[in-house]
């Protein structure tokens, strides 16, 4: 009963919002739809430009400041009399965050953009094992000896015992909860 009451009130609210549009709202939407995407216009405009470096003048192009490691620099203006001078600067909070974080390392991509499946050989790609149920599989290597006595490594993507225990406990808990509530 509560469920149907909630959705009926929600439906009426959405219906009211749809029917309460005025002609001005519709004109604004038509204007927005008639122009090309705002983002693509900005990208087309800025493709040919080079950015303005930090501590250089940006009076003529206030949105052309370069990007730091993480954040974009801002054009800060100072007015003296009738003239106004603007310089690309970095905000203090951005400077503190960038100095604390440093360079953001790019995550290494797998060789063929696919992960190594469970129990497959991962000797060459030890960090690219696929994700299991909740956790990512880990590459585990074992020492093997041939008939000649030569040592070789046998590597495979496996799930550690702790991860198996946690996933098993969650499966059992989910089943118990489902059985209790009749699902």
From Swiss-Prot:
Pro-peptide positions on chain: 21-47
Signal sequence interval, chain numbering: 1-20
Keyword annotations from UniProtKB, A to Z: Amidation, Cytolysis, Disulfide bond, Knottin, Membrane, Neurotoxin, Secreted, Signal, Target cell membrane, Target membrane, Toxin, Transmembrane
- Which Pfam families does this UniProt record tie to the protein? Toxin_35 (PF10530)
Q: Which GO terms describe its molecular function?
A: toxin activity
Q: Which cysteines are joined by disulfide bonds?
A: 51-66, 58-75, 65-88, 77-86, 115-130, 122-139, 129-157, 141-155
- In chain numbering, where does the motif Processing quadruplet motif fall? 44-47
Under InterPro entries, the record lists: Spider_toxin_CSTX_knottin (IPR019553), Spider_toxin_CSTX_Knottin_CS (IPR011142)
Q: Which PROSITE patterns match?
A: SPIDER_CSTX (PS60029)
This entry carries the following GO cellular component terms, namely: extracellular region; membrane; other organism cell membrane
Compartment list: Secreted; Target cell membrane
Post-translational modification Tryptophan amide, affected residues: 181
The answer to whether UniProt assigns keyword Disulfide bond to this entry is: yes
From the UniProt entry, list the residue stretches annotated as the region Predicted alpha-helix: 164-177
Entry comment on modification after translation: Cleavage of the propeptide depends on the processing quadruplet motif (XXXR, with at least one of X being E).
Q: Name one GO biological process term.
A: killing of cells of another organism
* Tissues where the protein occurs: Expressed by the venom gland.
Q: What does this protein do?
A: Spider venom toxin that exhibits cytolytic activity by forming an alpha-helix across the membrane. Lethal to insect larvae. Causes instant paralysis and death in the larvae of the flesh fly (S.carnaria) at doses of 20 ug/g, at doses of less than 10 ug/g causes reversible paralysis. Has cytolytic activity against insect Sf9 cells. Causes stable and irreversible depolarization of fly muscle fibers, leading to contracture at higher toxin concentrations. Destabilizes membranes.
Q: What family does the database annotate? A: Belongs to the neurotoxin 19 (CSTX) family. Double-CSTX subfamily.
The domain section of the record reads: The presence of 'disulfide through disulfide knots' structurally defines this protein as a knottin. This toxin contains 2 'disulfide through disulfide knots'.
For this entry, the protein name equals: DELTA-miturgitoxin-Cp1c
